[in-house]
Amino acid sequence: MEGRKPFEDEFYDITKDIYTHDEFMKLKLHQHHNSSIYDHVMDVSYFSYRACKFLKLDYQSAARGALLHDFFLYDWRNHDVPDLPAEKFHGIEHPKIAIANAKKHFILNDIEEDIIRKHMWPLTLVPPKHKESFIVSFADKYLASKEFFDKFKQNNVRRQIKKTPKAHKPHKKHNDPHTQHDREPRV
């Protein structure tokens, strides 16, 4: 694609088989905070790729594992499927679902699998065993928090606008002959 930097081309080449996969594309239909899961994992993946490349770690595994870390196809806030975890257990259970989905469609190496399993650490108790897994875990928390607070700020601004008294809202222009600049000259 024209106009992209070389590292962006490399990132897309590394992850193309995942982000273009039909089953993975279904993540576009499920909400994260104020974006789709697809957009969220793309952001986490790219952030992790850049960090690991800078640190001279396995940036390919980081990018691929990060892309698959939330590969679950349900709305965790609102579903009635008995086999899926209740909202309060989603944080602990969804890595297991993501790993099962990832293994069904892709071949994973040890780092990628560790990234998916441990990205919710410390909630999942067992710490990551690879530096790349730590980076993805922190990138996920940072970007999910940013999404949440951006949404919160956006909603808070809307509430404040609704509460603003009429005296503080902008007035419509009125036809005051003493303030009009394009009026006819007095005779």
Task: For every predicted segment, state its role.
Residues 1-187:
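Metal-dependent phosphohydrolase cores
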